[in-house]
């Protein structure tokens, strides 16, 4: 079962997100599944919206969420992100090939 994660909270900023990515991957951006120290993340997107910075993830299974949480550890708290993301099972999902321009 696919698991969705949405993280859009007052303490999540682009700068804090970027620092989490640097600490988690050693890189400035996540561009490939091989950049991550865990398996099972199918979709990752992050960007600035009208209500603040937002991160959206789709995991293949609950076990992948646990691998994600274990890899993150306390990094979010260390950079000042106070609220956790929301996780819930997907009711419906579809995908199309993504072309990068």
Language-model regions, residue ranges each:
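Short S/T/G/P-rich N-terminal loop/turn motif that feeds into the first structured element of a domain
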Residues: 1-56, 60-74, 81-101
């Amino acid at each position: 079962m696919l698991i969705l994660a949405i993280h859009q909270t007052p303490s999540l900023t682009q700068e804090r997100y970027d620092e989490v990515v640097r600490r988690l991957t050693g890189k400035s951006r996540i561009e490939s599944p091989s950049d991550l120290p865990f398996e099972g993340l199918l979709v990752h997107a992050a960007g600035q919206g009208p209500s603040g910075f937002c991160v959206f993830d789709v995991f293949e299974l609950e076990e992948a969420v646990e691998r994600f949480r274990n890899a993150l550890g306390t990094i979010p708290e260390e950079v000042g992100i106070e609220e956790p993301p929301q996780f819930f099972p997907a009711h419906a999902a579809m995908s199309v090939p993504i072309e990068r321009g």
